[in-house]
Amino acid sequence: MGLLQDYVIIVTGSASGIGYATSSTALREGAHVFGVDVSPLPADLCDHPNFQSFQGDLTEDSTAQAVVTACTQAFGNRIDGLLNVAGVLDNFASVDAVTDQIWNKCLAVNLTAPVKLMRAVIPIMRTQKRGSIVNVSSKAGISGGAAGVAYTASKHGLIGVTKNVAWRFKEENIRCNAVCPGGVLTNIGSDIDRESFDMEAFETMKPVQLAHMPDQSKGPRITPEEVAQVMIFLVSGLSSKVNGAVIPVDDAWSTI
C-alpha cells in the first residue's frame, strides 16, 4: 500500500518539471491525482486510470473554483491535498528596472493563484476535518540574492501565506507547509524575455548562484523527483505534526 493510498490530491503545474514529477510519484503511491496546467497534460499521466486533468489559466478569476469543482466531480466531494507547484520566473530585474508586466505576472501566478486555490479547497477540508497543503516557494523566498525583485517578493509572500494558513486552521487538522527548492532543471524560465534580462542585477547575484552550482557545466544540483519526494512526505500521514514548516530542498544552499 502506498503512502497516499486513495488520497485525492490536486497538483498544479502537472505538465512538466516538479509538478509532473509530483503527479507521477503520487500516482505510484496510490493517490487519485487531479492535474492542472495551462499547457496540455502529458499522455502518460492522462492514460493513468487514477489521473484526471484540467487545462486552464490559474490567473483567471474563475479558474481556481472551477478546478476544485471539477476535482470533486471526478473523484467525489473529498480533497486530501493541494500541491501548489505552478510558477513563473522573472528576468532578474531589480526594483529600479522591473516592469509592471513582469511584476504583475509573477504575483498573479506565484502568489495570487495559490491563495485562490487554498481559498477554494479550505471549505472542503474544514468539512472533512483534515487536509494538507504544500506550496512551492524557492530559495528566493528566504533570500534576497537569488532572483529578481518580482519573483523574490512573490515567493516571500507565499511563505507568509503558508504560515498564516497553518496557524489559522491547525485546530481543524488542516496543515500547510512550503518547500524551497534550489536550482532544479525545469522549464520555468522558458518564457523569460531575454531582451529585458537585467544582466547588471544578475551579476550581483552570481556569487550566490555559484555557491550552489560552482560547476555550471554540470547543471542544476536538484532533480524534480527529489523535490517531489519531499512534497509527498508533507502531504502524507508521515508528517502529521509538520505544520507551518518551510523546508529547503537545496543541498545546503539555504545555509548561506
From Swiss-Prot:
Compounds in the chrodrimanin family such as chrodrimanin A or verruculide A exhibit strong inhibitory activities against protein tyrosine phosphatase 1B (PTP1B) and therefore, they could potentially be developed into drugs for the treatment of type 2 diabetes or obesity. Furthermore, chrodrimanin B, the end product of the pathway involving chrodrimanin A or verruculide A, does not exhibit the PTP1B inhibitory activity, while it functions as a potent blocker of insect GABA-gated chloride channels. Pfam families: adh_short (PF00106). GO terms for molecular function: oxidoreductase activity. The active site is at S137 (proton donor), Y151 (proton acceptor), K155 (lowers pka of active site tyr). Keywords: NADP, Oxidoreductase. InterPro entries: NAD(P)-bd_dom_sf, Sc_DH/Rdtase_CS, SDR_fam. Belongs to the short-chain dehydrogenases/reductases (SDR) family. This is Short-chain dehydrogenase/reductase cdmF. It comes from Talaromyces verruculosus (Penicillium verruculosum).
